[in-house]
């Protein structure tokens, strides 16, 4: 069975995987500290594979990413690159974007424990994650224009939604390095912590709170609703009502109410695997929900 697979014993490329532990928390560590955790194509490919496996694994309830050593990730390893350029504009696919979409499409909550400087895809890969916690000493840069290219990893979608269009344009246009607590990054991080060594412990604390106290299916559907970006309150009302209809009939709803009234920790049982064929939400021509995932 998939949930018996040992992530930690598999030979990943410059990645260390811990867990999932008894609470369902898995940690993916970028383990290339001698190169400031710069990403290579094999690392990226392995992360996409890991996310796909953990998405389908009921024993995984939350995924935390962090970096080995003082850096989180210095971006793509420019000495190796991210593979060949597509033969045409229409066939080329950004490798960083494939990772971003794998994170976005993973139905488990993801947390970035940004323990140090994050540059380029090192920061854009975190934008689709549910939560970002950064060390106060971390430095952040979106340096694409300084390399003669443009934003990657679907960051032109995520960054403006996180920090606002004005700040996003400033960050993209300058490509400069900013401290994690810069006003330009306001909205990007849920928390900034000090010292840097406390970044992962704090992320694990948040992950444990989610894994122990929140319904997996409820967490996913709520995030799905947020990303639908309804154009009006009425549209949001219809989407929420459709999702609530399915959840009112779930074991998790019954347990959530019962545990609250009994003043105890909930024991949620619904899993993504069991719910994979329900909960479809429609919006115009777009059908979204547990069963819908765009191909990478």
UniProtKB/Swiss-Prot annotation:
Sequence motif: Peroxisomal targeting signal type 1, positions: 294-296
Knockout consequences: Abolishes the production of AF-toxins and their precuror 9,10-epoxy-8-hydroxy-9-methyl-decatrienoic acid; and impairs the pathogenicity.
Single Gene Ontology MF annotation: enoyl-CoA hydratase activity
Top enzyme category: lyase
Cellular compartment(s): Peroxisome
Key words, A-Z: Lyase, Peroxisome, Virulence
Catalysed reactions, semicolon-separated: a (3S)-3-hydroxyacyl-CoA = a (2E)-enoyl-CoA + H2O; a 4-saturated-(3S)-3-hydroxyacyl-CoA = a (3E)-enoyl-CoA + H2O
Pathway: Mycotoxin biosynthesis
Entry protein name: Enoyl-CoA hydratase AKT3-1
Gene name of this polypeptide: AKT3-1
């Amino acid at each position: 069975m998939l949930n018996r697979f040992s992530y930690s014993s598999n030979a990943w490329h410059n990645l260390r995987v811990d867990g999932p532990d008894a609470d369902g928390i898995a940690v993916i560590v970028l383990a290339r500290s001698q190169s400031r955790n710069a990403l290579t194509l094999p690392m990226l490919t392995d992360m996409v594979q890991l996310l796909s496996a953990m998405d389908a694994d009921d024993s995984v309830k939350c995924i935390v990413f962090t970096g080995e050593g003082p850096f989180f990730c210095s971006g793509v390893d420019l000495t190796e690159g991210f593979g060949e350029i597509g033969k045409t504009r229409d066939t080329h696919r950004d490798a960083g974007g494939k990772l971003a979409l794998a994170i976005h499409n993973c139905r488990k909550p993801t947390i970035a424990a940004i323990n140090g400087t994050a540059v380029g895809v090192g920061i854009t890969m975190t934008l689709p994650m549910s939560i970002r916690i950064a060390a106060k000493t971390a430095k952040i840069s979106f340096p694409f224009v300084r390399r003669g290219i443009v934003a990657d990893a679907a960051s032109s979608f995520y960054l403006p939604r996180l920090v606002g269009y004005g700040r996003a344009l400033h960050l993209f246009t300058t490509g400069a390095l900013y401290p994690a607590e810069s006003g330009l990054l306001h909205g990007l991080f849920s928390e900034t912590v000090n010292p840097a060594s406390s970044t992962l412990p704090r992320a694990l604390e948040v992950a444990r709170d989610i894994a122990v106290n929140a319904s997996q299916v409820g967490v996913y559907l709520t995030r799905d609703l947020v990303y639908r970006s309804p154009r009006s309150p009425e549209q949001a009302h219809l989407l929420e009502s459709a999702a609530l209809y399915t959840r009112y009939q779930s074991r998790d709803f019954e347990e959530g109410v019962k545990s609250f009234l009994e003043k105890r920790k909930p024991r949620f049982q619904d899993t993504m695997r069991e719910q994979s064929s329900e909960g479809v939400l429609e919006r115009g021509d777009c059908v979204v929900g547990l069963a819908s995932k765009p191909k990478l």
